[in-house]
From Swiss-Prot:
PROSITE patterns: RIBOSOMAL_L35. Belongs to the bacterial ribosomal protein bL35 family. This is Large ribosomal subunit protein bL35. GO terms for biological process: translation. It comes from Rhodopseudomonas palustris (strain HaA2).
């Protein structure tokens, strides 16, 4: 069985923590920001932990070596 390669797009978008959780940037910051309040825009900064089931799928299919 050959080694599985990590998907390069996922490598740039996701980070796996030491405890195995998957982190990613907040969604919803590409367009349509004029409708949001300053507080809403500010709260979209930084990263977040992805739900466990989604994180498991990301690790299985896109980040097999993580």
């Amino acid at each position: 069985m050959p080694k599985l390669k990590t998907k390069s797009g996922a490598k740039k978008r996701f980070k796996v923590t030491a405890t195995g959780k998957v982190m990613s940037a907040q969604r919803g910051k590409r367009h349509g920001m004029i409708k949001r309040t300053k507080k809403q825009i500010r709260q979209l900064r930084g990263t977040r932990v992805i739900f466990k089931t989604d994180g498991d799928n990301i690790k299985k299919y896109f980040l097999p070596n993580a």
